């Protein structure tokens, strides 16, 4: 299994994850599409920590994901070491920044 798990609070991924009824994030940039595909969004459940952790683990297992986003909170990313986990967190944030800028420019995405 992974040797590193990183938790970050990136502003773009966190902001976009707050969209109502959104269950996955879909990168529009080529790096995000190629390396990430769809990114699962997990609903936070502070009242039931065991269920919350189970959902995080299950989301990471889906499609062999390298990272998941907790709605309105942040990113959990995994890797064989810290650098790899950091790379996945960085790719997600870059992709969500591109998406946010495209939306602000009213580009069709």
Model-derived features: positions:
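Glycine-rich flexible loops
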Residues: 1-109
């Amino acid at each position: 299994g992974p040797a590193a798990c990183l938790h970050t609070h990136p502003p773009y991924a966190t902001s976009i994850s707050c969209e109502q009824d959104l269950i996955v994030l879909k990168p529009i940039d080529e790096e995000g599409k190629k390396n990430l595909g769809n990114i699962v969004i997990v609903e936070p459940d502070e009242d039931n920590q065991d269920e919350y952790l189970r959902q995080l683990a299950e989301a990471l297992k889906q499609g062999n994901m390298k990272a998941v986003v907790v709605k309105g909170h942040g990113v959990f990313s995994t890797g064989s070491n810290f650098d790899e986990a950091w790379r996945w967190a960085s790719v997600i944030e870059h992709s969500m920044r591109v998406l946010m800028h495209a939306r602000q420019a009213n580009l069709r995405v």
